[in-house]
């Protein structure tokens, strides 16, 4: 019996992949740091063993899958090589696995996790579908027809894949610790496009994506009239969004989605276009769109007294704009309060003015200290550099969250890719203690 051992099993992609293999009746275990991470809940539900790092975890007969964050000098990887056990990097293993199915890669600077989750949910309503989402969610079906997965452009990892289809949501400059500029990002997506085997579904409203060259058909979607799939007559409501879809200027159907903001319409359009191309029943698509409950850390909302709390992974100015827009659509009468933790010094420095501009669209802004990456030097930048660019912005720590109580009818949006949830948890605890 083959045992799949994951080095760094709590990573979002690694956790998802472990769940898929387990669901396909394989024996799975893994190791990681002992600090609790949100991805391990799904692993624990499946009774997948999570061990502390130890070279003795590695045994002959295992298949070793290593997370990209762990170097070849990691004790378990060294142990595997000493035993002549091949070590598969996450993205290479995933590339091999998907070749057995009709595979759909979802990529883009923003929106890929939400779009992957939505596509997986919609496809499941029509055909057996396995999926891997970048929020740590994975699901494997032994007799799958489709394999839907999130493909990240960071360090060009997505070039390990040769999918049948690719959805490209947008191209934007991010990860300044790796990419030099927007042209460098574009070159990565262009290289990816040439590896797609059947078709590309791309947002035609994105100027960079319009320049993509491919050996396969490129189907464009968006709001502009030149797109193959166009959303028209958009009704933005507090219970979701309704819009008509026109295919090459001919009315196709009317769809309702549970999401808010223009970005949610675009994500749904991408899914509708792919399903149309694959002849998925439109009634199944319409039904599944109305039952989608979202993905982890993307506009996750809960009421707390008179306030509403939203947890969101937004960590780039474009994403902050989208999240604030969505909050205003759903809660037009409420004050919008942004609690933001910048993620990495390199990103914060590169987009300092853009962060200030996007955050200023909230009614009030609170800033947490910058969450640095282990790979980078702090440099000269401080959170005060961002604060002074935003009128009325205040600094906040996990011990001073009680200041948020004054926003009695507020939507409190906790945004960031670091440990922003620590601040949210501190505030929830503060409110609960006060109520006793």
UniProtKB/Swiss-Prot annotation:
UniProt EC number: 6.3.2.8
Entry keyword set: ATP-binding, Cell cycle, Cell division, Cell shape, Cell wall biogenesis/degradation, Cytoplasm, Ligase, Nucleotide-binding, Peptidoglycan synthesis
Predominant place of localization: cytoplasm
Enzyme class: ligase
GO biological process: cell division; cell wall organization; peptidoglycan biosynthetic process; regulation of cell shape
Gene Ontology terms: cellular component: cytoplasm
Pfam families reported in the protein's UniProt record: Mur_ligase, Mur_ligase_C, Mur_ligase_M
GO MF annotation: an example: ATP binding
SUPFAM superfamilies referenced in this protein's UniProt entry, alphabetically: MurCD N-terminal domain, MurD-like peptide ligases, catalytic domain, MurD-like peptide ligases, peptide-binding domain
Subcellular localization(s) per the UniProt record: Cytoplasm
Substrates-to-products reaction catalysed: UDP-N-acetyl-alpha-D-muramate + L-alanine + ATP = UDP-N-acetyl-alpha-D-muramoyl-L-alanine + ADP + phosphate + H(+)
Binding site for ATP: 108-114
Known pathway: Cell wall biogenesis; peptidoglycan biosynthesis
Role played: Cell wall formation.
Family listed: Belongs to the MurCDEF family.
Annotated protein name in UniProt: UDP-N-acetylmuramate--L-alanine ligase
Species assigned in the record: Bacillus cereus (strain G9842)
High-level lineage: Bacteria, Bacillati, Bacillota, Bacilli, Bacillales
């Amino acid at each position: 019996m083959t045992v799949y051992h994951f080095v760094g099993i709590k990573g979002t992609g690694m956790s998802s992949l472990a769940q898929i293999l387990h669901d396909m009746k394989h024996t799975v275990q893994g190791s990681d740091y002992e600090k609790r991470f949100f991805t391990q809940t799904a692993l624990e539900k499946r009774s997948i063993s999570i061990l502390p790092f130890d070279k003795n975890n590695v045994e002959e007969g295992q298949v070793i899958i290593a997370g990209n964050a762990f170097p070849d000098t990691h004790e378990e990887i060294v142990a595997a090589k000493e035993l002549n056990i091949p070590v598969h990097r996450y993205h290479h293993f995933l590339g091999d696995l998907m070749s057995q199915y009709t595979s759909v890669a979802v990529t883009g600077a923003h929106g890929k996790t939400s779009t992957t989750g939505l596509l997986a949910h919609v496809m499941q309503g029509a055909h057996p579908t396995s999926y891997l989402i970048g929020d740590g969610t994975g699901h494997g079906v032994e007799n799958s027809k489709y394999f839907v997965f999130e493909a990240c452009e960071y360090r060009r990892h997505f070039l390990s894949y040769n999918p049948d289809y690719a959805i490209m949501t947008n191209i934007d400059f991010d990860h300044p610790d790796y990419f030099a500029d927007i042209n460098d990002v574009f070159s990565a997506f262009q290289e990816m496009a040439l590896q797609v085997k059947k078709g590309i579904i791309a947002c035609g409203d994105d100027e960079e994506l319009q320049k993509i060259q491919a050996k396969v058909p490129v189907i464009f979607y968006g709001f502009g009239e030149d797109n193959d799939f166009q959303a028209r007559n958009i009704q933005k409501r507090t219970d979701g969004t309704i819009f008509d879809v026109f295919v090459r200027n001919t009315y196709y159907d009317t769809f309702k989605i549970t999401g808010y903001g223009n970005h949610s319409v675009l994500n749904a359009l991408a899914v509708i276009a792919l399903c149309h191309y694959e002849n998925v029943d439109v009634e199944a698509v319409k039904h599944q769109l109305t039952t989608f409950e979202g993905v982890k850390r993307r506009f996750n909302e809960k009421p707390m007294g008179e306030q509403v709390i939203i947890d969101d992974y937004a960590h780039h100015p474009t994403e902050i704009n989208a999240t604030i827009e969505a909050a205003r659509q759903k809660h037009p009468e409420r004050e919008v309060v942004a609690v933001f933790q910048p993620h990495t010094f390199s990103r914060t420095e590169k987009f300092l003015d853009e962060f200030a501009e996007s955050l200023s669209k909230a009614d009030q802004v609170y800033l947490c200290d910058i969450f640095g990456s282990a790979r980078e030097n702090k440099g000269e930048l401080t959170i005060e550099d961002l604060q002074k660019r935003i009128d009325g912005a205040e600094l906040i720590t996990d011990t001073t969250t009680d200041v948020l109580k004054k926003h009695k009818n507020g939507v409190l949006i906790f945004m960031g890719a670091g440990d922003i949830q620590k601040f949210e948890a501190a505030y929830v605890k503060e409110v609960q203690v006060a109520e006793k």
